[in-house]
């Protein structure tokens, strides 16, 4: 067997998951193998791959999660000159390695002008697939380029890297097996490759094309026992087209003798059973008269009882043989009926940079919920692996995967999934790194937690308030109060150096609050706010923090100090930059009025209410004012309070704007608990899955990207009026990263209910 054949048969590495893979194999059909461990000698020309510098399959050892061997740098070092367009596109992807459209344009341009320069083609594919290893169509194109120049060992190398990068793709395994059939003559080499593939994707609901190719190959070999065994294995799994497979199996059983359908092991077991039956029959006849066993006088012979028995039981054996498979089929169909709705709602079962729609995202959560309840760990792992191919750009699914594996006691799987998420698939999204930091802290890896926070501070999203708060809180939990204070001060110093910082007021406010909560040093907390007012214009978040701070202090309250600062924010000033929106100004005015309602006097309350009416009531829209019918003016306050809230509160006189005066700040000024995952929405209606997926062209799934496609931006939270009783309601400002959002559902999909408006996070929120 040649080197390339050895790689095809056995791959570069052992199968992923360690002990898990052995258990996974036991639930596969009879005869299915795990991917075997490879000896270094099988990859003479690929030592780096064998020795661990190459990628490994999804879910393998956590110390190696690279999924392709990228170029040393983005650029050309092949000795050839770049065209102007190539240079332009390389500059784009160097600046932003996630610019998918620029990458595909660069590949097209390189293929156009460098058809015979395989080194340049390798360079661009290596670099692209290092960023987007799940694009199976581009692995196929890469392999085709290597085949075109006759480098068969390189073709195998590309396919091996491909199945390491997108292990749970039916399509890439199908392309690899097809290549092996067309290239190698040794049936055992090809069969071992099929068996490697089926370990990972044999139970995939959409695995029919791969099973069909395997059946087709064995039909060409006319190895009917292997064909029958493949059908048997298929019928054990609830996959697509089960009815067709069962019908084909019955047709095979009707047209071939049972002796051809049974494997050697099955034939041996049947022979033992027949021999046992014959022995029992002989023992029962031993007491019969001797003359009953003689030949008749006329010389005629009797048919052997054993042969007669064998002849009469063959149809029964065939019926039993088929009946066992039919029972498998019925059981699989029963489970299929439970999952078919989820499977049909998966409109895009492969990776794509375009966002998924809301219905598909919800369907994945619902499907995972169902499989987790079913309790089959192997099914859970494989569905998660399918999910994080389709939903690779969504941190919530990686977080859920890691959390589930942790809860199941599978720390290695959790660690590996987290490494893939943070190092490859969502490496530029801060929430995955914040989750990683918390998980590492829980597991005692304090240095790793600090490194995760530092990565966010320095590279992923510098100045992200959530990261600062969580990092400082961790240092406080560890007893490093000075380090927590220092962290706030360092970030504040950086933000002060910026010409326009959107988070500086929030940083000051949070630092003041944190300082007071952990040290009860009221003077220091007040100094922080006062210092803030020396560096930034008074703003809603800063004023909220100051009002709240005064509210929790013992008398006397510094109302005279607060009043001009609040007025500076809520009064529009043509000569000064207005940093607060009209909604923010009105909300702050209401908060201040409620504060005065408790701690002020009648005179100060009246002044604030009159000012509120003057500033905000004349600007209400005519349509809003029309909502106040004559009955609203005549009805008593109690009647108004009893009216059903319909989500659009009518304008009210200022005197009636605070019905919940007793509902003050939350007790103990404490953060509210936070749980993950969030409550799931109602199950989405199943959508018709596109049946053409299984026969897609190798590259077609990646075509049709709109020109100028860019990653979608996070939606701006809907402003929410903040009653002071629920103080304070505040969102963090929009910062530099944009997590993936759901795409609009296509026209053919069922009409989705509009998502509820996202309430702004409370200023004093749930960060731990």
Curated annotation (Swiss-Prot):
Basic and acidic residues biased stretches: 286-295
HAT repeat windows: 116-148, 150-182, 185-220, 222-255, 341-373, 375-407, 444-477, 479-517
Biological-process GO terms, alphabetical: mRNA processing; photoperiodism, flowering; RNA splicing
Reported phenotype of the disruption mutant: Altered pre-messenger RNA (pre-mRNA) splicing. Delayed flowering under both long and short days, and slightly reduced responsiveness to gibberellin (GA) and vernalization treatment. Short stature and reduced seed set. Reduced levels of FLC but increased levels of FT and SOC1 transcripts.
Keywords, comma-separated and alphabetical: mRNA processing, mRNA splicing, Nucleus, Repeat
SUPFAM superfamilies: TPR-like (SSF48452)
Location(s) in or outside the cell: Nucleus
Repeat found in the keyword field: yes
Skewed-composition ranges (Polar residues): 297-313
Bias type Low complexity, positions: 670-688
A family per Pfam: HAT_PRP39_N
InterPro entries: HAT (IPR003107), TPR-like_helical_dom_sf (IPR011990)
Residues covered by region (Disordered): 278-314, 668-688
Expressing tissues: Expressed ubiquitously at low levels, with highest expression in seedling roots, developing siliques and germinating seeds, and, to a lower extent, in flowers, shoot meristems, inflorescence stems, developing seeds and leaves.
Coiled coil: none
GO CC, one annotated term: nucleus
Family the entry assigns: Belongs to the PRP39 family.
Protein role: Involved in pre-mRNA splicing. Involved in the determination of flowering time probably via the modulation of flowering associated genes (e.g. FLC, FT and SOC1) expression.
This protein's name: Pre-mRNA-processing factor 39-1
Gene: PRP39-1
